[in-house]
Amino acid sequence: MGPPLSPRESARFVAENSRDVLVDHEGVRRAAELLLPAAAAWRVEQWKSLHELNPRGADEAALGWVFLVDSLNFSFWAEREDSKCAVRYGGTPYTGYWALCAAVNRALDQGIPITSASYYATVSLEQVRDIFRSDTAVPMPLMEERHRILNETGKILLEKFGGSFLNCVQKSGRSAQKLMQLIVENFPSYRDEAEFEGKRIAFYKRAQILVADTWSVLEGKGDGCFEDISSITMFADYRLPQILVYLGALKYSDELLKKLLKGEMLLNGDKQEVEIRGCSIWCVELIRDRLLELLEKGENSPVEINSVLLDYHLWDYAREHREDMKGVPFHRTRCIYY
């Protein structure tokens, strides 16, 4: 079997051959119309102001923060909604992905050089447990895997890129696709691939979000001026499919819906899990295309809407509408890829 299809082609192939997940074209149209009023104002510069935990700089240190966080950006969902890992920082308790960011910032404030490759290449499991400790009785999931990835990733960054993710970014020649390939080729934990209907496919959720966050932290300038940023798709995790189902743009079969409502686990690489992720990516591509059509028809000046900005907005929308979405199940998969 040859190299995997790209995330976009993987998504198209999965959507065309999916049995339990369907992209609803009328729902896509309605979702685009719902998002339209906000879409014209989306800008890469908003990433830093989007959340108080994101780094404010656009330098090597900020890139080091982004690389560390995206290397650990997986599996934050709680077994029970009323019992979650939370990290208190600056007087505020954070859950999910933001608990990770809060723990990193807490460690940096305490003088622990957690974003330095020479530190996390040799950090012990005990130190990792302490750095990412929860302020509730519920620990952050997959702590052993996080420790292993920190050691592995740190060693590779030191050996191949002089300990700096900036060197990796500069090798990409300002290409989002080249940077994604460099990440996937050099760092094994980013190889988010599967087999589906006889083809090798790839979603590369963390590699793509690392490219997107690099673009965002550098505000699309200098080393982060990726002309091909629109080739990056949405990041196939467990929250985005939930919001797409809530918006009516994605539909599940009765069999799959029953399984998800019961809280049954789906293994990474299972056919239904692949269908959920692939169809979600394709759904967002279609919403983006529809948004661009609507914006072109409007009075607005041309706007660059890409799947990265759309993903950021949908993810925030999901957090804002968490209560409304309680009846929509998310798929439960424990893995290091998302």
UniProtKB/Swiss-Prot annotation:
Alphabetically list the UniProt keywords: Acetylation, Hydrolase
> Where are the active-site residues found?
237 (nucleophile or transition state stabilizer)
Give the matching InterPro entries: Q_salvage
GO-annotated biological processes: nucleoside salvage
The record's account of tissue expression is:
Highly expressed in liver.
Known catalytic reactions: queuosine 5'-phosphate + H2O = queuine + D-ribose 5-phosphate
Residues recorded as bearing N-acetylmethionine in the entry: 1
Q: Name one GO molecular function term.
A: hydrolase activity
Name the enzyme group at the top EC level. hydrolase
Q: State its Enzyme Commission number(s).
A: 3.2.2.-
Q: Where does queuine bind?
A: 51, 235, 237, 311-312, 316
Into which family does the record put it?
A: Belongs to the QNG1 protein family.
Job of this protein: Catalyzes the hydrolysis of queuosine 5'-phosphate, releasing the nucleobase queuine (q). Is required for salvage of queuine from exogenous queuosine (Q) that is imported and then converted to queuosine 5'-phosphate intracellularly.
Under which name does UniProt file this protein? Queuosine 5'-phosphate N-glycosylase/hydrolase
What species does this protein belong to? Mus musculus
The UniProt gene name for this protein comes to QNG1
